[in-house]
A protein has these predicted regions:
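Outer-membrane beta-barrel translocator/receptor signature
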Residues: 1-80, 105-111, 124-125, 207-208
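Acidic, glycine-anchored loop motifs typical of Ca2+
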Residues: 81-92, 174, 267-274
Length: 320
């Protein structure tokens, strides 16, 4: 007989596209004698989402020593800085070196398929063959804006934590302008799996059952980003920050910078394209292929109602 089913689902994710689909279907057929049958299963799923994030690099622990200018310099603080709620001498503090604020847009497509065929010419013998396919594609774009600290912090306020003191406000005045960064990333991966199997189950007699299995699988993983790479990272920067500060006391840290393009820009007092310069562009690629071939032959011989003898042999080859 024939049987079929179809499922359709829509997912509402307000962080990406409002509605993304998921479709799956199953079909099976057997002949009138129930000696031969085929089944097919397939599914497709698409997801879109987004996220916002912040990051602080070099969570570096230092020891506070207000009497040692070198210790302050090690924290990126100038000797005559204004320090609010200063830690006690000998207390641990940490020094942030930058703040990055950004967002991601992510997309994923997943496809699965399975084909199975079975043939039973009689009650004692059954042949089964199957083929499976799976594909998962993920793409992501990211934009990050951020500030680097130059090691000339002239105002800092600490949070008063008695274990590890952390800055709440970190600010510095940079004469002549310094850079702040814009990082663009495009990332993509594609994973595929193909697997084929063949099986024979044979009741030779009431006492002897033989089983034969053969399987071959290959999985491949690689880049699906620009030019086939996993990651494209492109950085640009504007060297026109005259004063900058970060407020770590917010739910999401906030950063601000004033523009001074008098020495490293076009001196028009406006941050524009002429104040931006290219930085590092980096490609990252990673590819992997794994293959597994398997073979097994085993059987069971019933000597009596209480005694059985199992026998078999197997082989497996793995390559990566």
């Amino acid at each position: 007989g024939t049987q079929a089913s179809l499922g359709v689902k829509a997912v509402d994710d307000t962080s990406g596209d409002e509605i993304t689909p998921e479709v799956s279907g199953l079909y099976s057929w057997t002949n009138d004698d129930a000696t031969f049958g085929v089944s097919v299963f397939g599914s497709f799923q698409e997801r879109d989402s987004g996220s916002r994030h912040s990051s602080v690099e070099e969570f570096g622990l230092r020891t506070w020593d207000s009497t040692n200018p070198a210790n302050l310099a090690n924290l990126g603080i100038v000797a005559d800085a204004t320090i609010e709620n200063a830690p006690n001498d000998g207390q641990l503090v940490y020094r942030p070196t930058n703040l990055g604020l950004g967002f991601n847009e992510d997309k994923r497509e997943r496809t699965n398929g399975l084909l199975t065929a079975q043939f039973a010419p009689n009650d004692e013998m059954t042949f089964t063959a199957d083929f499976a396919y799976a594909e998962n594609i993920q793409d992501s774009t990211s934009l990050i804006d951020g500030l680097w600290f130059n090691g000339t912090v002239d105002y800092v306020e600490y949070d008063g934590n008695p274990v590890v003191a952390a800055p709440v406000i970190f600010a510095e005045d940079v004469s002549g302008g310094k850079d702040f960064f814009f990082q663009n990333l495009a990332m993509g991966t594609k994973d595929t799996l193909e697997s084929f199997g063949l099986n024979l189950d044979w009741n030779v007699s009431d006492q002897l059952n033989l089983r034969f299995d053969l399987a071959s699988s290959e999985a491949e993983s690689g880049g699906n980003g620009p030019l086939g790479h996993n990651v494209l990272r492109m950085n640009v920067a504007g060297a026109t920050a005259g004063w900058q500060a970060v407020d770590f006391g917010q739910t999401i840290p906030q950063g601000v910078a004033s523009i001074d393009d008098s020495s490293k820009g076009n001196a028009n007092g406006v941050f524009d394209a002429a104040d931006v310069g290219s930085q590092v562009t980096q490609f990252t690629s990673s590819d992997q292929v794994a293959k597994i071939d398997q073979f097994s032959f085993d059987g069971t011989f019933a000597v009596s109602d209480s005694v059985e003898v199992d026998l078999g042999l197997g082989f497996m080859s793995s390559e990566m």
